[in-house]
Amino acid sequence: PMLGPLVLFIIWDLVVRFKLIPPILLPSPWTTLSTLFVGMAGGSLSGDFAYTLIRTLEAFLIAAVVGVPVGVLLGSNERAYRSVEFVIDFFRSTPSSALIPLFLMIFGVSDINKVAIAAFGALLIVLFNSAYGVINARKQRVMAAKVMGATRWQIFKDVLIWESLQPTFVGLRSAVSMSLVIVIVAEMFIGSERGLGHRIIDSQQVMNVRDMYASILAAGALGYVLNIVFLVLEKRIVHWSGR
């Protein structure tokens, strides 16, 4: 798994050494990594990292707590889901960044705004995947439960919920990544004083490219770690999927 990053850093180093890109625009990878490690080991970068992480987790938790149960309930009644499917698909297809002015009007320039717009974008992903997980549950297992005399409630809690776990986890994994993306975009453009997004755009404006690239690497590392965490959780909790 380290081969890809190693190749990337070698290419990056060669580009800098042969001055294919001016050093003022692209510092060496080793200088960037040094800035990253110093900043994360007690520098101001660690504080901005923490702000972005907290906002991302807040947005994700709101999306998960609301999206999973609502998605499962809608999925258990396909007619109810079809009645709101257009609205869900419409907003799911709308770039969340296009909704920033709307959220600015509602919440103003505040941390709540950043969390709210990220939670909204992530919520639609969770809701969609949870609902479709229930709708597309294996018909054989549902029929087997009916044959054994299970009630609708028993089928819902013992079959449909478990059948929806894998697509729900796929939705959660996508949602946490979406939360991070939207939070960073919001930090860039919604009057933020702290956070990786603010740090990236601020560094770019003053041509502090080492700090800019270090912040980008920190954001990428955060997204990668969050994705790996959910992959591990999915494998442990839904290990029986497909059997």
List the model feature ranges, each with a label:
Residues 78, 135, 166, 170-173, ...:
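C-terminal transmembrane helix and the adjacent membrane-cytosol boundary/short C-terminal tail
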Residues 116, 120, 152-185, 214, ...:
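Transmembrane alpha-helices
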Residues 105, 134, 182-219, 242:
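Glycine-rich helix-loop "coupling/hinge" segments at transmembrane-helix boundaries
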Residues 47-55, 105-126, 164, 169, ...:
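Loop-to-helix entry region at the N-terminal start of transmembrane alpha-helices
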Residues 69-104, 118, 129-132, 143:
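Cytoplasmic-entry segments and transmembrane alpha-helices of multi-pass inner-membrane transporters
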Residues 3, 7-8, 46, 50-74, ...:
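Hydrophobic alpha-helical transmembrane segments of multipass integral membrane proteins
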Residues 129-168, 200:
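Short cytoplasmic-facing helical segments at TM-TM junctions of multi-pass membrane proteins
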Residues 18-61:
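Periplasmic/extracellular loop-to-transmembrane helix junction in inner-membrane transport proteins
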